[in-house]
């Protein structure tokens, strides 16, 4: 061993004494040898070497980065699974799955026989404090989730319903006008590219200078504006802590004195609530408006259910709408066909079984929600918009051709201890808004011939949706 150390020291001293040209040459040779040796290891000797996938993905992060930058990452993963099977190696130390079983095993609740798959480095970011979504520590996440959960309880959501109804009515009042989005919605969509750039920079550190140089000034300004907006919300809410009579999402966070909450920590939670509470619902509703406009028979069935049940839009409470079977089927189908989070959420294997395979400890794994929800062996005519697949067998519109669909393969809000905390709020928002819209308006797609929805979809951390031109006709004033 001492001989090896002495030889290494002598080699380094020799490099220092050599000319810069010779030193550069030596480093070039060493770098080349290192790359070749690493490539040989990754292709033939790495623990994941037996898993199929694109050759470039086994060697480097470039395959991953190329498809993220192109905005078609969910579709690239789907194509990889179509070509290579249910388990695909998508990076040197990363596997993608597309089965319903893997969903439960990677993201499901921890048991005595099921070790937790913690979140990967994808969630690391450059803000002082992580929000609940980015928190990788299971204990800290559990504490924060417990505090926030009170704001999403059935009792709390019942208290929030009047606010949701108020804003859905405001939306309906603006439908016939050419109204622009609020700036924070635009900001979230535009700044979604930051998620892509940060992820590529993390995987390919040598590209950081190029990424920072190419970052558009407009996006940075919008993101700073969004942070200022969230910070103002936090400061206003903290100042009103002792005067509010209704419990909101921050009530328990501020009331808990077991540990101090800095403004940065509160800001991180506010960012999550604003983004998750706006982009997800907006994406789902836009998708539903498009697909219903493109499938007038589905829109008609939805309107018949609502218009035959309710005399006034104000009668549409969340509790009553939960019983509208076709409405709920439409929403589930919209979430399946365009899931809000379309890529596999990365987790780190603790050295556990997934889909009957022992995945080495430290391997990054995920299940692609887009790919799983579009498998033809899980969903009959998976590319088609068919709310009927979600109806019970006794419903008049139930169709036997969907009876073997694997409905649990659609997980738009993930599942388990890290599943979406606001899922019930999201469903309430979608039910109330879509129900009132379909009760009050007819609508049709104006640019059907110029629009290819799926081919125009782009994913940059958030969906960038095509722009459907829809003409609305007011039926109930």
UniProtKB/Swiss-Prot annotation:
CDD domains according to UniProt: CYP60B-like
Species: Penicillium oxalicum (strain 114-2 / CGMCC 5302) (Penicillium decumbens)
Primary subcellular site in the record, as a coarse category: membrane
Membrane topology according to the record: Single-pass membrane protein
PROSITE patterns in UniProt: CYTOCHROME_P450 (PS00086)
Pathway annotation: Secondary metabolite biosynthesis
InterPro entries: Cyt_P450, Cyt_P450_CS, Cyt_P450_E_grp-I, Cyt_P450_sf, Cytochrome_P450_monoxygenase
Stated family: Belongs to the cytochrome P450 family.
Name of the featured protein: Cytochrome P450 monooxygenase poxC
One family name in Pfam for this protein: p450
């Amino acid at each position: 061993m001492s001989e090896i150390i002495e030889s290494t020291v002598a080699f380094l001293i020799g490099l220092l004494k050599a000319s810069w040209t010779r030193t550069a040459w030596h480093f070039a040779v060493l770098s080349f040898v290192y790359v070749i040796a690493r490539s040989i290891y990754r292709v033939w000797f790495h623990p994941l070497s037996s898993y199929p996938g694109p050759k470039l993905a086994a060697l480097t992060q470039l395959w991953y980065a190329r498809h993220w930058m192109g905005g078609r990452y969910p579709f690239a993963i789907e194509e990889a699974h179509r070509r290579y099977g249910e388990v695909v190696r998508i990076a040197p130390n990363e596997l993608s799955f597309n089965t319903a079983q893997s969903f439960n095993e990677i993201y499901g609740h921890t048991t005595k026989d099921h070790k937790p798959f913690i979140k990967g480095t994808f969630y690391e970011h450059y803000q002082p404090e992580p929000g609940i979504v980015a928190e990788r520590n299971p204990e800290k996440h559990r504490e924060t989730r417990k505090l926030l959960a009170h704001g999403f309880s059935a009792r709390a959501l019942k208290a929030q319903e009047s606010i949701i109804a108020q804003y859905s009515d405001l939306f309906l009042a603006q439908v016939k006008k050419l109204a622009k989005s609020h700036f924070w919605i635009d900001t979230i969509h535009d700044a979604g590219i930051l998620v892509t750039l940060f992820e590529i920079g993390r995987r390919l550190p040598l590209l950081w200078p190029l990424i920072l140089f190419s970052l558009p000034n407009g996006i940075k300004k919008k993101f700073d504006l969004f942070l200022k907006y969230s910070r103002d919300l936090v400061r206003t809410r903290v100042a009103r802590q002792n005067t509010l009579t209704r419990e909101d999402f921050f009530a328990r966070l501020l009331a808990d004195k077991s540990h101090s909450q800095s403004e940065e920590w509160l800001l991180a939670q506010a960012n999550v609530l604003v983004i998750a509470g706006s982009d997800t619902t907006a994406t789902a509703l836009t998708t539903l408006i498009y697909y219903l406009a493109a499938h007038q028979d589905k829109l008609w069935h939805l309107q018949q259910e609502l218009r035959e049940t309710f005399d006034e839009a104000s009668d549409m409470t969340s509790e009553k709408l939960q019983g509208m079977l076709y409405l709920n089927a439409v929403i589930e189908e919209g979430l399946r066909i365009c899931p809000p989070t379309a890529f596999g959420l990365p987790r780190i294997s603790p050295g556990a079984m997934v889909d009957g395979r022992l995945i080495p400890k430290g391997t990054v794994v995920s299940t692609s929600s887009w790919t799983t929800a579009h498998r033809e062996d899980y969903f009959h005519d998976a590319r088609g918009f068919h709310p009927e697949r979600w109806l019970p067998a006794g419903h008049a519109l139930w169709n036997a051709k969907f009876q073997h669909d694997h409905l649990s393969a659609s997980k738009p809000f993930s599942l388990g201890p890290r599943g979406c905390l606001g899922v019930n709020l999201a469903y309430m928002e979608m039910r109330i808004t879509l129900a009132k819209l379909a009760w009050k308006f007819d609508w049709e797609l104006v640019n059907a011939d110029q629009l290819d929805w799926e081919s125009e979809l782009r994913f940059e951390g958030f969906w960038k949706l095509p722009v459907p031109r829809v003409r609305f006709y007011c039926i109930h004033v």
